[in-house]
Curated annotation (Swiss-Prot):
It catalyses: IMP + L-aspartate + GTP = N(6)-(1,2-dicarboxyethyl)-AMP + GDP + phosphate + 2 H(+). IMP binds at D14, E15, G16, K17, N39, A40, G41, H42, T130, R144, Q225, T240, R306. GTP binds at residues 13-19, 41-43, 308, 334-336, 416-418. The lineage of its organism: Bacteria, Pseudomonadati, Pseudomonadota, Gammaproteobacteria, Chromatiales. It comes from Halorhodospira halophila (strain DSM 244 / SL1). This is Adenylosuccinate synthetase.
Amino acid sequence: MGTNVVVVGTQWGDEGKGKIVDWLTENAGVVARFQGGHNAGHTLVIDGEQTVLHLIPSGILREDATCVIGNGVVLSAEALLEEIRELEARGVPARERLRISPSCPLILPCHVALDHAREKAKGKAAIGTTGRGIGPAYEDKVARRGVRLSDLFHRERLAQKLGELLDYHNFVLKHYFGAPTMDFQEVLDQALAHGEELRPLTADVGALLTAEMRTGRNILFEGAQGTLLDIDHGTYPFVTSSNTCAGAAAAGTGVGPRTLDYILGITKAYTTRVGQGPFPTELDFDDEMGMHLGERGHEFGATTGRQRRCGWFDAVATRRAAQINSLSGLCITKLDVLDGLETLRLCVGYRCQGELCETLPSEVETLSECEPVYEDMPGWAESTSGIERYEDLPENARAYLGRIEELVGVPVAMISTGPDRNETIVRQSPF
């Protein structure tokens, strides 16, 4: 039997999952996306060449990997086709390697328009979405009025569903937000054209994955965003619109939860966040340490281009993420960004309303008032960039990683020491 591995982010996204997934696909026959949409930006660097994927699983660059987009993903057909064409222009036969669940809810132009209109109306209180229609598409899914990929293959069915949907959303756009409305015929024609192109790529994803498991192929489930952005367990309402935890891998692809063998949590050696919301260990952009992390780590979002907020490693939040996901191992990324710092700080608790707290508050209002309690550790002057053996790391770097293991309660299985796939230390292979 093969091994089924789930990769999830343990922070607020941008942990470096794309590179690690790409590295792990050497041992995976199938790579599956199970939630989110094209709001996720996975950056891969292979032989110095950078590729940013938003929807298609990172394994698409592997010749022998089958890539799957599961039913838990909200699908922008336009964005997907654009990504497919970009890959084909680079000589990657994406259509041959990609299969998509026909049950995927679609992101339509009205969802993007609603996303922008809402953020504009909220002003300074805006959540800081990517503006790509993810939230409104998930809303329609839950409200049972959404259009699915399979609807694009049936003109009359699509016309009826789309007409009802646009009547609803155009009313809100026009009378509530004072925003332009969507033209029914234009949206219908575009959707039908997308359906023609995507129909050959559809498959029963649950059945496909189950069949692959029976043949003994390893399967990698690729998460997007991060645990602290989970719609239920994250810093609500400053979260994404899907379940980003490991449990969603089963529901978002149609396989049973007992088929998941190993859960790998990706975390930076420090912490970053894009958009609004509480961030206890945040450092100011003009702070010397905050500037170091931002500049050395090239902390700009792959999807939005926004500068990421940077701070020290938060062991309290990561420990909670480890519990929610039942992590088997941690992968620490961007360790090399900490090179040259004299002192490193680890958040080991919070001081909330005068009391010491060692767990992550569930209410965002309480978390916003929390002050980090730090434990200082000595840094290292040596470069860790490109190191591929754990024993070759500086002694203080190994001590830092060991302390993270103790605080989070999960072994460090992998360490990334640079953006290239080869700049990776493996202590325990998930496969």
